[in-house]
């Protein structure tokens, strides 16, 4: 370990859409989207548990929508390749229990306020982050980690990745010793495979056609340390190898540990749940501030009380990278962004059924998501003139 004492190494991980926790996230968000297609004002909190050939769908949904929850779940399993008993869960035959109730009236009375205002669905703290170290304004490690499992899954679905099964994980260590010239130190991938496979050929394919390919996409080095299935064998995976649960990949969903996290998960929750809407809003604000050149890195924390529309607090951290006075950044935020629940929902168009696409490979960095838009850059640049 002493050999790394002079290095500055940071690591993030991601998982594929076939990972058991991500299966649950996808089902939760697929149900949310199906409900929102029929009822944009629905209140949804949907959780999923997955194990060997079994799913439990539970939570609270108050809506006029009529949705076949079981069919939605089976469709998600099919999309991820779970159609074979050998994989531990079969979309066509697995048992599914539904335990859905209505939202508590005690919570409902705090959400629907007068004057078209919406109260926060719960108390809590949320964070959003942006950095200029990548084109997506996300930290490098999590960006590469997502791309690795996305690429591997895409090749598996196209039939190019021999022996690969749906369950995969990636882990990327970035060497920041030279802060202006980061490089990849280590890539770890654990990829489920068929029992009868050629280990040497399998690992060679991963290194040459996934790891090296992704590294080159980011114009980074390919002489990194490589770890592939370190235990030597990964046949039993998916919900059979490890139970899945909605909301258990909150760090991979966000910034890979590079920024703080308030603890609240996203998937399966409608936008009155500030765990989701406020985290998206914080990302939107931070990204626009960084893109406007007010700082190289920005993290925003907000807090809410149940039943109250406006945030209790807003805190901004720039890690000493701000290009203008910190008070100027606060001024820019307060004058241009409204963190009330109803305003966040309107600004980010959060009543639309857009959430399934967030349930895999991160909730941030995808250009077509409304909280990734850069529509405040010009107005924010004006604050550089008055600092």
Swiss-Prot record:
Needs which cofactor? Mg(2+); K(+)
What's the domain of life for this entry?
Bacteria
- So, what pathway does this thing act in? Amino-acid biosynthesis; S-adenosyl-L-methionine biosynthesis; S-adenosyl-L-methionine from L-methionine: step 1/1
Cellular compartments per GO CC: cytoplasm
Q: What gene does the UniProt entry assign to this protein?
A: metK
Function as written in the Swiss-Prot or TrEMBL entry:
Catalyzes the formation of S-adenosylmethionine (AdoMet) from methionine and ATP. The overall synthetic reaction is composed of two sequential steps, AdoMet formation and the subsequent tripolyphosphate hydrolysis which occurs prior to release of AdoMet from the enzyme.
Q: What class of enzyme is it?
A: transferase
Report residues binding ATP: 19, 167-169, 233-234, 242, 248-249, 265, 269
Alphabetically sorted, this entry's keywords are: ATP-binding, Cytoplasm, Magnesium, Metal-binding, Nucleotide-binding, One-carbon metabolism, Potassium, Transferase
* Residues at which Mg(2+) binds: 21
Annotated region Flexible loop: the residues are 103-113
Single GO MF annotation: ATP binding
Residue positions binding L-methionine: 103, 242, 273
Q: How does it assemble?
A: Homotetramer; dimer of dimers.
Family of this protein: Belongs to the AdoMet synthase family.
Q: Which GO terms describe its biological process?
A: one-carbon metabolic process; S-adenosylmethionine biosynthetic process
| Pfam families recorded | S-AdoMet_synt_C, S-AdoMet_synt_M, S-AdoMet_synt_N
UniProt xrefs under NCBIfam families: metK
Q: InterPro entries this protein is in? A: ADOMET_SYNTHASE_CS, S-AdoMet_synt_C, S-AdoMet_synt_central, S-AdoMet_synt_N, S-AdoMet_synthetase, S-AdoMet_synthetase_sfam
Query: Which HAMAP family does the record cross-reference, listed alphabetically?
Result: S_AdoMet_synth1
Return the protein name: S-adenosylmethionine synthase
* Sites where the protein binds K(+): 47
Cofactor binding note from Swiss-Prot or TrEMBL:
Binds 2 divalent ions per subunit. Binds 1 potassium ion per subunit.
Enzyme Commission no: 2.5.1.6
Can you say where in the cell this protein is located?
Cytoplasm
- Its primary localisation, in coarse terms, equals cytoplasm
Reactions catalysed: L-methionine + ATP + H2O = S-adenosyl-L-methionine + phosphate + diphosphate
């Amino acid at each position: 370990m002493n050999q790394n004492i002079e290095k500055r190494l940071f690591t993030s991980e991601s998982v594929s859409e076939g990972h058991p926790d991500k299966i649950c996230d996808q089902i939760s968000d697929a149900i949310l989207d199906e409900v929102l297609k029929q009822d944009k004002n629905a209140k949804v909190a949907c959780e999923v548990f997955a194990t060997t050939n079994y799913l439990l769908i539970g939570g609270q949904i108050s809506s006029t929508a009529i949705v076949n929850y079981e069919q939605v779940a089976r469709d998600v399993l099919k999309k991820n390749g779970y159609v074979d008993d050998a994989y531990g869960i079969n979309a066509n035959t697995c048992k599914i229990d539904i335990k859905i109730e209505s939202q508590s009236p005690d919570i409902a009375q705090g959400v629907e306020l007068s004057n078209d205002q919406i109260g926060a669905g719960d108390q809590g703290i949320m964070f959003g982050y942006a950095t200029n170290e990548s084109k997506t304004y996300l930290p490098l490690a999590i960006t590469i980690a997502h791309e690795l499992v996305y690429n591997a899954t895409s090749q598996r679905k196209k039939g190019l990745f021999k022996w690969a099964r749906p369950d995969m994980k990636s882990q990327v260590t970035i060497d920041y010793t030279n802060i202006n010239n980061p490089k990849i130190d280590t890539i770890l991938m654990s990829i489920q495979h068929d029992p009868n496979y050629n280990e040497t050929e399998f690992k060679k394919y991963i290194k040459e056609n996934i790891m090296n390919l992704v590294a080159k996409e980011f114009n980074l080095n390919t002489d990194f340390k490589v770890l592939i299935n370190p235990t030597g064998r990964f046949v039993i995976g998916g919900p059979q190898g490890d139970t899945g649960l909605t909301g258990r990949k909150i760090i991979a969903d966000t910034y890979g540990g590079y920024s703080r996290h308030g603890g609240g998960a996203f998937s399966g929750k409608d936008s009155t749940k500030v765990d989701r809407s406020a985290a998206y809003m914080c990302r939107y604000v931070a990204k626009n501030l960084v893109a406007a050149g007010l700082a190289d890195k920005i993290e925003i924390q907000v807090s809410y009380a149940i039943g109250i529309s406006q945030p209790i607090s807003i805190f901004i951290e720039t890690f000493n990278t701000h290009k203008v006075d910190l008070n100027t950044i606060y001024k820019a935020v307060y004058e241009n962004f409204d963190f009330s629940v109803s305003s966040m929902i309107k600004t980010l168009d959060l009543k639309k059924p857009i959430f399934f696409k967030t349930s895999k490979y991160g909730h941030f960095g995808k250009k077509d998501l409304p909280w990734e838009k850069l529509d405040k850059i010009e107005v924010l640049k004006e604050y550089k003139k008055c600092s």
